[in-house]
């Protein structure tokens, strides 16, 4: 991607579909198009370091989908379709990578279950 003078960049549930080996390069390109004080908003599905807690949050999300009228079959089919395509990472992995590519400060500013938005300041 080509970016110039990007004061705000928003990546909503995008990075999780980029192969892990290319994520740093993409974020480095974004950062290089930003000036100090510019902002990146990064929203992603997270995986938690505690497997039991991670599974619990996934089940809560599935319960939410059921309440919205999705069948168990639809939920299972979507999960299988995303199985090897959506590769989530931990909060720590995201924060470390953002620092590595040159963002000075970053942290989660919003989270619901295992979906989070991070803010990173160039």
Where are the model-predicted features located?
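Short catalytic micro-motifs in class I SAM-dependent methyltransferases
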Residues: 12-16, 44
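C-terminal alpha-helical "lid/dimerization" subdomain adjacent to the S-adenosyl-L-methionine
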Residues: 46-101
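A short acidic, Gly/Pro-enriched loop at the edge of an enzyme's catalytic core
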Residues: 1-9
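A short glycine-rich, Lys/Arg-flanked "PGG" loop and its adjoining helix->strand segment in the class I
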Residues: 24-36
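Core SAM-dependent methyltransferase catalytic element
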Residues: 95-122
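Hydrophobic beta-strand segment of the Class I
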Residues: 9-10, 98
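Conserved beta-strand signature within the Rossmann-like core of class I S-adenosyl-L-methionine
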Residues: 34-46
């Amino acid at each position: 991607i080509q970016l110039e003078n990007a004061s705000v960049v928003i990546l909503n549930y995008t990075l999780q579909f980029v192969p892990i080996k290319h994520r740093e390069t993409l974020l480095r390109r974004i950062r290089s198009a930003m000036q100090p004080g510019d902002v990146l908003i990064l929203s992603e599905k997270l995986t938690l370091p505690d497997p039991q807690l991670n599974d619990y949050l996934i089940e809560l999300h599935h319960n939410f989908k059921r309440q919205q009228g999705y069948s168990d079959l639809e939920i299972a089919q979507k999960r299988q379709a995303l199985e090897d395509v959506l590769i989530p990472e931990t909060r720590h992995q995201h924060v470390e990578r953002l620092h590595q590519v040159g963002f000075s400060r970053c942290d989660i500013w919003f989270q619901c279950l295992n979906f989070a938005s991070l803010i990173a300041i160039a």
